[in-house]
Amino acid sequence: MSVSVPTLDRIRNLEQLYRSGYRSATVDATIDKLLSVEVAKARQEADSLRSRLAELETEYGMSSADFLRRFQAGELGDSADMFEWSAYYQMWLSAQERVRLLEAQAV
C-alpha cells in the first residue's frame, strides 16, 4: 500500500505544528473521526475475509494457519483454490494488523 506524498507531507506538517505547541479541537475531532471510520472499514474487511476463510476451512478440514504452513511447505499442491486461500488469508492478516494499529490510536 503506497501513501500519497502530499498526504504524508500534510501529516508531517501537522505533526510539526503540534510538536511546537499548536492545538486545534477541530483537528483533534477530525482525526478521531477518521480513525473511527478507518477502524470500522478494516473490521468490515476482516469480517468479510474471515467468512470466506471459514468456508475454505470447512471445505478442506483445516485451519487457515495450518493450511498456510502446509501450502508454503509444498504439501497441498497448486490448485486455484490453494492460491485463492493463501491470498485471502494474507489479506485477512493484513486487515487484522490494520485494525490493531488503528485501534491503538483511536480514542
Please name every model-derived segment.
Residues D78-A104:
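Short, compact, well-ordered microdomains
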Residues A54-L76:
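Short E/K-rich amphipathic alpha-helical oligomerization segments
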Residues A29, S36, R43, Q72-E75, ...:
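Heptad-repeat register of long alpha-helical coiled-coils used for dimerization/oligomerization
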Residues M1-T58, M62, E97-V107:
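Small, basic N-terminal interaction modules of short regulatory proteins
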